[in-house]
Amino acid sequence: MNDTTDIKHTSQLTSGDFTEAREPFALFEAWLAEATASEPNDPDAMALATADADGLPDLRMVLMKGFDARGFVFYSHIASAKGRELAANPKAALLFHWKSLRRQVRVRGPVTPVTDAEADAYFATRPRQAQIGAWASRQSRPLESRLAFEQAIAKEAAKYAIGAVPRPPGWSGWRITPLQFEFWHDRPFRLHDRIEFRRSALDVPWTKTRLYP
């Protein structure tokens, strides 16, 4: 393996010492803002890890569609693989990786469904074609052919040719409420910075720990 990529200039890394942060939400917000300014594609993309009832893990990329002190929100079909797994085991982990900044953030915690009002409000902001696609798709189910999918899309488009497209009853969102954050920043020669924030419950203060790289 070629390790020349390990030799990086300090000026490439960060502005300010993130290890001095006292709580994780403001730090994440600051890093996300920098990623939004510098990351060429989807700075809100995150890897979502779930596990089924047998404990077998699963992983996929999704888009974060909301973030505040309550947690991170994403949307999908309730009957999708992720939806079924979260119903059986309502815990998850997230990973944000911003290559242009040489940073990543890990998040772990329990998952709860968003309210119908939240799901309705977000669905109303989606492009019309995406709304129609949500009706046509049976996410994670076997599909006979691309043509069959396009025919289903055309059928739903005709059905909702006039007026607003309502949210499908089987389409909603989830919120992962963090009990753990880890902020990782690349440093030369693999001497990285890692800061972990943990709490045992939502009403317990955060404990910050610096970790060996």
Curated annotation (Swiss-Prot):
Signal peptide: none
Coiled coil: none
Classification via InterPro entries: Pyridox_Oxase (IPR000659), Pyridox_Oxase_CS (IPR019740), Pyridox_Oxase_N (IPR011576), Pyridoxamine_oxidase_dimer_C (IPR019576), Split_barrel_FMN-bd (IPR012349)
Co-factor requirement: FMN
Cofactor note: Binds 1 FMN per subunit.
UniProt keywords, alphabetically: Flavoprotein, FMN, Oxidoreductase, Pyridoxine biosynthesis
Task of the protein: Catalyzes the oxidation of either pyridoxine 5'-phosphate (PNP) or pyridoxamine 5'-phosphate (PMP) into pyridoxal 5'-phosphate (PLP).
Protein name: Pyridoxine/pyridoxamine 5'-phosphate oxidase
Provenance organism: Nitrobacter winogradskyi (strain ATCC 25391 / DSM 10237 / CIP 104748 / NCIMB 11846 / Nb-255)
